[in-house]
Amino acid sequence: AIDKRIKCVACQVPLVSGFRNIQRLVRQDFLAPNRAAMDQDRAARFRGEPPAMVPVVDPDPLAVSALPTPDSWEWFSKTGKRRAPAWNNEVTLRSIEMLMEYEPSAHLERISPTPLLMVVAALDHLTPADLALEAYQRAREPKKLVLLPGGHFDAYVKDFETASGAARDWFLEHLGSSG
């Protein structure tokens, strides 16, 4: 949105509002304890201590994790492990705190006249589809929406050909071919 050297934008199962996303993913009664843990982590890092780590996923949806959805557990514990066997199930608590402050949709109206493609999964609960569709409505032309039938991780497996094909076609249309 800010760098006009960018000739086109494609986003797939986008996170459009970190704050609203966290409000959906984390139970309300967990927010205050999570905030307290983040405050303690920030103070510890200031003292030179290592950052607090939390699991990315956990089979228990009530346990502390960065991505507390069943499809996240399925993806990272099975598909992700198969594709990236060296992956460690941990992320800094600071990363979650920074996610809460990440608001890319604040710039959405300023992307135009750069062409925008949004690939949204209709059943996405990790980066909620309704938030992405709301953001798409706010975006100005030129824009295009591709709605996938599945959930968040289906964009990388079951619906990969559709998602990646849409991005490829978008880039070819707006960037041309180099061959």
Question: Which functions belong to the PLM regions below?
Answer:
Residues 166-178:
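C-terminal alpha-helix
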Residues 150-164:
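Catalytic histidine-centered segment of alpha/beta-hydrolase-like enzymes
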Residues 127-144:
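Active-site-adjacent alpha-helix of alpha/beta-hydrolase-fold enzymes
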Residues 1-76:
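Alpha/beta-hydrolase-fold enzymes
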Residues 24-25, 90-108:
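Active-site nucleophile elbow and catalytic-triad environment of alpha/beta-hydrolase enzymes
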Residues 106, 133-134, 169:
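Active-site phosphate/pyrophosphate- and oxyanion-stabilizing loops and adjacent acidic/basic residues
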Residues 100, 120, 125-131:
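Conserved alpha/beta-hydrolase "acid-adjacent" motif
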Residues 111-112, 117-120:
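Short beta-strand/loop motif that positions the catalytic acidic residue
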